[in-house]
């Protein structure tokens, strides 16, 4: 290959049952607590890790992932527990499916964790985790319990638990700068401030919403100290423990390289002040300068993940008689088990409460004390159930209103974008991404109030994923025919409504879950864990959500009609800015129809974008939810690029939270290597020459930042005389690694008459 040149210029389950997985992938998250209490016989210790990959007994709870084949993964899924080569200590290593010492059996009946390679049991030796023959000591006894996983892949705030005048204070990038090595500080949380919005990735990085590869990192030492550091932003680095973080049971954000150091701040949170954040050792476990709340908290996700706590049992005597009498009295003899109706749709719990409250002890029940105890308990349960149901009814009302105009909205947008909705053309339609973008808009524009809706909605999504795979009906489709798009959206809407209903029923059937949920209903609205909807501006919330959903539908439909035309800096373009153009240091991007590079979108369409806060940079670079293919274009043809119409330039879209890289080769010749930022697309911007008419094949290999394979495929460029090139993925060439999914490739023909290249966009998602 010749002429290579860079042209870009620059449920009520038992604990044991919960610890079982139905998948070969890491699925269920848990923590392990030792019955060993230390020298003071008080301090609890948990199975944890150190920065040397040695496993230790620590006061900090660590979340692990259990697979059905017995592997115990770190929460990031990158490493597994194994016995060291000496056969004694336990350490973290990469997965080796052929190693039996990486297989463990958790016995929740006898509180033992046994290694299948040597038959020994998990033990503690001077706070180091080891394996040893069964000895009956407390150091070999472990209680395991479900842990709701730290939500990854969702955007939100990290707010300080210190509140001043009811103002939120959050982790912030100074001045919303996208430059690396920018200080991370404390500021009051403000609407539409991307520098305050973060995402915890699956490998423990904390990603900023400001830019794709911008992450939280350790900054310079404070006065030369080895235990006190400033925080700043940096480029995402592979396997760098200084950029990887965890959250412990004290709501402290600790660093994986310095596990004893946590994020905090020093000073007073004054009005409109900026305070430097630091990495240091907290003065105590309850030092609020080092305690954080992830907002949304997804508190419901935590609640439904806990060990079930049944209602007080009434099995005999006057207790049972009282319960059955009150049940029959309240339900007009419909049932003697009133608790079975807490989830009933067509029953009035308010009516039941009134009857139970006014009931008197019948002569057939001898113990008025037992009757009174049961009566008070059922009254409390009904009060709790009424408020819990009201929370979900309000959410369902919001959600139903959001999608009530779905069919007409989709039709109107299709007409505006000039899309044939009866077509069998495939589009990328990931419903989960659409819902996530709605929740992001709510928390971004309405930090107080919007997070409550996001809390319920995202918890419902997480709850659906925690259900058994045979029952879960989530949004698993990444591509769908246009003619089936509305059906697809409606089906997934109904599934998510069902998930919320199922989560509500699970809560109403468990005394512990119902009590905890009820308590959240009376927290102040500005508390990140609150479910208190009193006083919320639902009109504003609905308006923001409706706009976000409309934008999500535009993201699905737009690539069927439009693409981006890129011209390198220094070459003539008809427009460099305006409603359908954007320029940066590399060149100019223009939106036009796929067939005609001089046919631009109507103002009504562009107004829906720019008037609703869509970032031009994100749009034209196909970042976040946008996925438009990009064609290389020269409006004034030069001899140097006169064969541009013969070429095809691929774009890789990374919908995941981990950076990727891709390389395109032809017959062994490397045509270019490119990094794809998280949630961004990367356009292959290296000019190359191509041969005669017919098929020409180019191989593309995609890896993540750690050099792990993601996908491989072959691009087929077909040349015909006096026509622009045709581009596609060669049949049978696509190989996708487990854990990833490739959406519908967007393939657009080049043009001989208008002198632009073919384009192909390949979207890559993280699959469950």
UniProtKB/Swiss-Prot annotation:
Signal peptide: none annotated. Gene3D superfamilies: 2.80.10.50. Disulfide bonds: none annotated. GO terms for cellular component: cytoplasm; membrane; nucleus. GO terms for molecular function: carbohydrate binding. One of its GO terms (biological process) is response to cation stress. Keywords: Cytoplasm, Lectin, Membrane, Repeat. Residues 25-145, 116-248 form the Ricin B-type lectin domain. It comes from the Eukaryota. It is a peripheral membrane protein. Its main location: cytoplasm. Residues 1-22 are annotated as: Disordered. SUPFAM superfamilies: Ricin B-like lectins. It is found in: Cytoplasm; Membrane. Belongs to the cup family. May play an important role in stabilizing and/or regulating the cell membrane during Ca(2+) stress or certain stages of development. This is Putative calcium up-regulated protein H.
